[in-house]
Amino acid sequence: VVIDAADYAKVLEELNNGGVTRETKFYLAAKVFENTAAYDALISSYLRGITGNAFPDKLTLTYEKAQTMRYGENPHQNAAFYKNPLMTPGALSEAEQLNGKELSYNNINDANGALDVLREFKDEVAVVGVKHANPCGVGVGATVAEAYQKAYDADPISIFGGIVATNETIDLEAAEKMAQIFLEIIIAPDYTEEALAVL
């Protein structure tokens, strides 16, 4: 069974050369079962959500590969980023990368940590700095620029090369402050055009 149009050319080529190889058959079979298992797991997850059963006797989770990472926890390791198809609002997996190089495992881990801390600030303009899975600065202010300055001042050494996240739109003033040092990732719900030109 061929369930992915991306595999058609490979299967046709092998058929034209005498038959589909054993290796390809196992590859295709695995792909079919991955998809049917994922489908069943999604239905189970949906129904569990309706019934409110948070702790079922058996739990099957399914994730879709979002991207291959630049590298794993260390440069010699491989990694991939998977997302839950039944994503929650504000999940990192739904973020759009606007520019920059491919992300690494550490980038994803730090970005997720920054968002976890940021969720604690629902009614305040906040900025969180994270590096190597540790918060290195948190600031609250009237503006993103003010909150960023407080987060930066908490530890101006550690925040260099780290991840910064805010829960408000980044404007030109905030972008100019952030652009003064190297930051791996800057996360925000939105950016003004002027801010994007600086970053």
Residue ranges and their predicted role:
Residues 7-199:
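Active-site loops and adjacent core secondary-structure elements that bind or stabilize anionic groups
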Residues 1-2:
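Active-site cavity-forming subdomains of large catalytic enzyme subunits
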